């Protein structure tokens, strides 16, 4: 059985006890959301998949997102998060300017906030995930789709509590190479499946930002080819620096007070 059919069956199994539930998925127009949405449609039917487009102001490739929704025949919503991001950043800047007992005075707090790369990248991603869960609340028993893949996860190329969140992850254990193979197997348009992935904000591709290609990353993860030592060093450094994104939250337990924080996690099975 192909990986595509295995994944479709897995989604069916996930929803087995939730026969009326819908899959709520953010549609960016990139390969991951396109392929994850197509898998959900194959598993559940188009009437049980809701695509949510969330541009931040003007999105140059919004046409790709609309094409995905039209092609799959799914209900689509467009919610522009641009104003929300701007207002929230303004309020954060204002709080820094006038906060009592703030020992780090910021004379130009607005510039400090809007130019901070962590805020510029991660705030929109978290607002998008908040939006998806708000939409999910409108549809009883719906579940939010995580669209991250194994390659991105390995080097932490996602936002904690942003696109790294969700209720179920069809692509989380598949490398970019395997995701592309599924997209081709499903017969999805090549310009969507093989579109160069980017964050849609800085004008650079993911590979430009990472400093190596997904082919190199997948070769390293799967052990399928020689990878330059400098690239290996970059991959390992990113993996170690971002492991906190995927570890369970360290949680104090009175019975385990001698354990190190990194050894104490919530165990929901107990």
Regions found by a protein language model. Give the residues of each.
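ATP/NTP-dependent adenylation/nucleotidyl-transfer catalytic domains that generate, transfer
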Residues: 3-25, 39-42, 47-50, 57, ...
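Conserved G/P- and acidic residue-centered "switch" motifs that form tight phosphate/ATP-binding loops
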Residues: 30
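Short, surface-exposed alpha-helical segments at coil->helix boundaries
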Residues: 33-37, 62-66
């Amino acid at each position: 059985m192909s990986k595509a059919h295995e994944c479709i069956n897995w989604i069916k199994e996930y929803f087995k006890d939730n026969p009326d539930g819908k899959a709520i998925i953010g549609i960016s127009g990139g390969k991951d959301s396109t392929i994850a949405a197509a898998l959900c449609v194959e598993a559940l039917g188009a009437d049980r998949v809701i695509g949510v487009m969330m541009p931040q102001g003007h999105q140059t490739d919004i046409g790709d997102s609309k094409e995905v929704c039209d092609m799959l025949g799914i209900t689509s919503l467009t919610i522009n998060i641009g104003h929300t991001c701007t207002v929230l950043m303004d309020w954060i800047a204002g709080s820094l300017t006038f906060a009592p007992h703030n020992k780090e005075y910021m004379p130009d707090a607005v510039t400090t906030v809007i130019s901070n790369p962590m805020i510029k990248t991660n705030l929109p991603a978290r607002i998008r995930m908040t939006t998806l869960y708000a939409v999910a609340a409108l549809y009883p028993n719906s579940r939010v789709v995580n669209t991250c893949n194994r390659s991105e996860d390995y080097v932490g190329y996602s936002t904690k509590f942003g696109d790294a969140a969700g209720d179920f992850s069809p692509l989380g254990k598949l490398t970019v190479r395997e995701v592309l193979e599924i997209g081709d197997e499903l017969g999805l348009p090549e310009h969507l499946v093989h579109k160069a992935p980017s964050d849609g904000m800085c004008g650079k591709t993911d590979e430009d930002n990472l400093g190596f290609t997904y082919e190199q990353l997948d070769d390293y993860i799967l052990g399928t080819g020689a990878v330059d030592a400098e690239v290996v060093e970059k991959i390992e450094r990113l993996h170690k620096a971002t492991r906190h994104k995927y570890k369970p939250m360290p949680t104090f337990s009175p019975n385990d007070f001698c354990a190190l924080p990194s050894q104490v996690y919530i165990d929901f099975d107990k």
